[in-house]
């Protein structure tokens, strides 16, 4: 086992300052002036309590268990559970959807399901950035009657999808001892630390929390924050908890990459952020330029106030786009006398939007991080639903450097609601 890690100071990248590159129109004055996501009614479907006990003939099937050994042992693809659910529903064609990093295992899983369930399988090769990309619409158009969505949590409830859905989190076992010793080395006894990660590492987070709280040598108090309806300790790139800066002294993200961690860094700029990479076992101190991000976003909001025609984009990558949010935005924009052009796009690219010459600005109902991370690269403002409502003076952006990251919270814009952000001004 490698020695425990002291945090490495990640060098801040030297990049040109981001700025909004579009130009404000000249000589134009500013004008004065719930239900679940597209629920499909299916009276024949009963959502109720089900028995969770997988039959012994599946669990103890020697041939099946040998086939499962072809998959990595530290990745839990829940093959027994999947087979049981497919057999129960008597489905004939099953769609398998997973992020690109897991596609290497897709054909093994496909062969196992075809052999032990006597079904046809279709591996969906389009990108799957998150649970919002679950593509039950495409699966149904391919005559699938069941879809297995891997590596993401149940962001889109199973009672509103067009076909039967099974979410497989693909939890990953990691070296907990190394993580525990790393935390103990870098923090004082009794420190309160927020710990979170993607759903793959959720069991690890809760296991490490219990072990450190009961550590007789150097107890630590780990707090897995929760933004309902997400699980405790789960974070998304667009949704994270607002932490109590008076008590939480640091936050630790378990996972590779920074995308999901940045959500919490944007939402909690006052709290030091650390990242533990379970693959390289490196522990690093992470930084985010909040001021630059908020300056760029405020500039885009300010520029959009001059717009007379706005392109309202509905994301068509899986279930990224929420038609209810789109309708609310269209109504609010129209009330201000702004002409609305509705656009459907699976992926929102600068060169694509540049073709809409007569549109002054865009509002996208797809992924808020697209605007936050890449909005500066578009030649016209590209606002999130939150930013559009701020521009229309129907939501709040505080003077302090806190930007809300609650898109898929229970009252978030991603669910067709308008959240309360009045606390940002206090």
UniProtKB/Swiss-Prot annotation:
GO terms for molecular function: 2-(3-amino-3-carboxypropyl)histidine synthase activity; 4 iron, 4 sulfur cluster binding; metal ion binding. Pathway: Protein modification; peptidyl-diphthamide biosynthesis. Keywords: Cytoplasm, Iron, Iron-sulfur, Metal-binding, S-adenosyl-L-methionine, Transferase. The keyword Zinc does not apply. It is an enzyme of class 2 (transferase). Its EC number is 2.5.1.108. It is found in: Cytoplasm. GO terms for biological process: protein histidyl modification to diphthamide. It catalyses: L-histidyl-[translation elongation factor 2] + S-adenosyl-L-methionine = 2-[(3S)-amino-3-carboxypropyl]-L-histidyl-[translation elongation factor 2] + S-methyl-5'-thioadenosine + H(+). [4Fe-4S] cluster binds at residues 132, 238, 367. Binds 1 [4Fe-4S] cluster per subunit. The cluster is coordinated with 3 cysteines and an exchangeable S-adenosyl-L-methionine. Component of the 2-(3-amino-3-carboxypropyl)histidine synthase complex composed of DPH1, DPH2, DPH3 and a NADH-dependent reductase, predominantly CBR1. Catalyzes the first step of diphthamide biosynthesis, a post-translational modification of histidine which occurs in elongation factor 2. DPH1 and DPH2 transfer a 3-amino-3-carboxypropyl (ACP) group from S-adenosyl-L-methionine (SAM) to a histidine residue, the reaction is assisted by a reduction system comprising DPH3 and a NADH-dependent reductase, predominantly CBR1. Belongs to the DPH1/DPH2 family. DPH1 subfamily. This is 2-(3-amino-3-carboxypropyl)histidine synthase subunit 1. It comes from Candida albicans (strain SC5314 / ATCC MYA-2876). The lineage of its organism: Eukaryota, Fungi, Dikarya, Ascomycota, Saccharomycotina. The gene is DPH1.
